[in-house]
UniProtKB/Swiss-Prot annotation:
PANTHER family: POTASSIUM-TRANSPORTING ATPASE C CHAIN, POTASSIUM-TRANSPORTING ATPASE KDPC SUBUNIT. GO terms for molecular function: ATP binding; P-type potassium transmembrane transporter activity. It is a single-pass membrane protein. InterPro entries: KdpC (IPR003820). The gene is kdpC. This is Potassium-transporting ATPase KdpC subunit. It comes from Staphylococcus aureus (strain MRSA252). The keyword Transmembrane applies. The system is composed of three essential subunits: KdpA, KdpB and KdpC. The keyword Disulfide bond does not apply. Belongs to the KdpC family.
Length: 186
């Protein structure tokens, strides 16, 4: 009888600790010390939320930097999500997979020697918000032409917004870069 009572007490204590106190403590720590990150790292422009620093978006206009291709086609449509059951993730296809090869060829829209790897392939999450500085610099002439500004101004903007990679190439956040472009005075 004593063993049963001890087992029930331990179960209740574990449920309270793991199911209530620990989540409450982590939520409080997140809200107090990491408020921006705990709430999605949302970016506001013109008094409205335009996206998250953590999730890439599908950019198609020539006047904006384009992010990495998405393995899940930036699946933010609830109908698609219900049908496909995927909201993020890589393709998990091998280098020899014909569908992957076709998708990469589709994303390579200009001379093959001029394409960075991140311009043609998706990230592991399928929603990476960053591109390499090299990729951004290769897009600079297109953006400069579309906005009727000098390529050097666009390149300066890229250099000003770049973030240092630890074990990776330097990179830029596409959404932040595009907002900076919109804020740029002609």
């Amino acid at each position: 009888m004593n063993t049963i009572r001890n087992s029930i007490c331990l179960t209740i204590i574990t449920m309270v600790l793991c199911g209530f106190l620990f989540p409450l403590a982590i939520t409080l720590i997140g809200q107090i010390f990491f408020y921006q990150q705990a709430n999605g790292s949302l970016i506001t422009y013109d008094n409205r939320i335009v996206g998250s620093k953590l999730i890439g978006q599908h950019w198609t206009e020539t006047r904006y930097f384009h992010g990495r291709p998405s393995a899940v086609d930036y699946n933010m449509n609830p109908e698609k999500l219900y049908k496909n059951g995927v909201s993020s993730g890589g393709s998990n296809e091998s280098n020899g997979n014909t569908e992957l090869i076709a998708r990469v060829k589709h994303h390579v829209k200009f001379d093959n020697s001029n394409v960075t790897i991140d311009a043609a392939t998706s990230s592991g999450s399928g929603l990476d918000p960053h591109i390499t500085v090299e990729n951004a610099l290769k897009q600079a002439p297109r953006i400069a032409d579309a906005r009727h500004i000098s390529t050097s101004r666009v390149a300066d903007l890229i250099q000003h917004r770049k973030q240092r990679g630890v074990l990776t190439n330097d990179y830029v956040n596409v959404l932040e870069l595009n907002i900076a472009l919109d804020k740029m005075k002609d």
